[in-house]
Amino acid sequence: MKLGFISDIHIDRSKTLQETDFLHTLSAYINDQALDEVFIGGDISNHYEKTIAFVEKLQAQSGAKIYFIPGNHDYWEAKSAKKHTLTIHDTFKSHPQSMLNKALIVGNDTAVVGHTGWYNHAYHDPAFTKEKLETGRHKLVT
């Protein structure tokens, strides 16, 4: 079994490349290398719905099994949106391609375990109160 790992592709940050460019390039590479499974280690995009759509399209286009572990950017959404980060986290946890808090046995002696490894240092900010913790919002990052 051939595995691939990549991270921080930020498909929506380029001034010249579109999402389709990333899909085409990654699919071609996956096929050229005959990869069976690919793990994307976060920061796919700056919006959770775009991240999910991208991994679904990449799996369909490449034919390989695509898994992802969301990074801090993947948890974002439009500033005007009111969805709580915990709701986005639950969306990721329930997605079949997400490795969030899951383990996958690969071959006979390897396991891949998904964890964001991300910690919000704003929790140590004195302005971060128990009330803000309960609302799930602090400076648009929790």
Where are these predicted regions, by residue range?
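Short amphipathic alpha-helices and their capping/turn segments at secondary-structure boundaries
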Residues: 26-31, 55-57, 95-108
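Short catalytic/ligand-binding loop motif for oxyanion handling, primarily in non-cytosolic enzymes
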Residues: 47, 76-78, 107, 112, ...
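Active-site-proximal loop/helix segment associated with metal-binding centers of metalloenzymes
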Residues: 113-142
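Beta-strand-turn-beta hairpins that frame and shape the catalytic cleft
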Residues: 1-4, 103-114, 135
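N-terminal active-site segment of His-dependent metallophosphoesterases
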Residues: 1-65, 75-83
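Glycine/small-residue-rich loop that forms an oxyanion/phosphate-binding "nest" at active or ligand-binding sites
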Residues: 78-101
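Proline-centered loop/turn at the N-terminus of a beta-strand
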Residues: 37, 65-67, 97-98, 111
